[in-house]
Amino acid sequence: MKSHYNIWIAESYSCQNDIIQLLKNSNLSSHLTIFCSHSKQRPELKLHADYFFQQPVVKDSSDWLLEQCKEHSIHLLFCGKHSQFIEQFREEFSRHDIQLVTGARGISKHKNVNNKFLFGQICEGLNLPSISAAKVAHVNELKQAIDEYQQRYSVICAKPVYGVYGAGFVQLSDDVSYFMKFQSNTLCNTQQFIEAYAQLEPPIEYLIMPFLQGQECSVDIACSNGKILALVTRIKFKFYQECYIEHPCHEICKILVEHFQCDGLINIQFKQDDQGAWHILEINPRPAGGFSYTQHTGINLIAELIAEKLHLVLKRPVPTTVVQVLPIIQSIKNGL
């Protein structure tokens, strides 16, 4: 067994620096040299990684990443953004003894979680608590789905079939003014949404769904080959978050992680209905932007993942069952 490994953290969302710092703060640090890359200028990554490189945009980066990994003798490549573009080249990385971590094993699994309509159908087929949804791809289909769902549910919403959670999501209401869209990006007049959708060329596939008005939670999970290594649930409040190492959604997560062969640092979103029952919103096969809040429970999710993949021994503090975490924003001067 090797005692030192070169790992590469490819472009991720806002949490990429957190990933690097959490590895540096663990006892794994002495066993790792951390390379990282991003397509944009990210000076904070240069501060904390051992080596930083400017990479092509993710969808065009597979060849570049493979060549860099070969040149620098990389043992593990972690992809935290649009990783389906890299997953399709898993065999090429494997031929060079490079472990590839993309959030799920197999391009079909990525397709199943990235298509939110298909994902919901699969969850329903597994008898898991999903949310009813109508898929539309034309303004006439949109009108019909809105009419149907307004008759069935007191409040409805719309969100794209593809995309990052929250992007393009709106709650629809007949009773708000058109101007409300400029005051709240998540609340829109129903007719205004229909008119805006009619102008799309080509139309975007959307889902019309009931809007659940209960509490929402976000489960951050380190997993390997469809098995959970560690998980923490976060509940977000306006000025703080609460983190739990035990939560009712965890049993559902085990089923989802195994079925979709999740593999990496991922995030699963849930929301409660009026009766307090939890429903699955989606799986993100990537780390959530706020996953680092979970470190205050004593569970270091990214370290758990890397320790498992590289067969390293991770030293773990005694975890805290429930913690309240406050964000602190601080600025530093960076020398040019």
Labelled PLM ranges:
Residues 4, 72, 239-336:
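ATP-dependent carboxylate activation and anion-phosphoryl transfer catalytic cores
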Residues 45-47, 62-65, 108-117, 166-167, ...:
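Short, charged, surface-exposed secondary-structure boundary motifs
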Residues 110-205, 225:
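Active-site nucleotide/adenylate-binding loops and adjacent lid/helix of ATP-dependent enzymes
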Residues 1-105:
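ATP-binding N-terminal substructure of ATP-dependent carboxylate-amine bond-forming enzymes
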Residues 73, 97, 127, 153-154, ...:
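Residue-level detector of structured alpha->beta connecting loops
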Residues 4-8, 155, 207:
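Residues that mark the start of a beta-strand
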Residues 182-256, 260, 271-279:
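Phosphate-binding site of ATP-dependent enzymes
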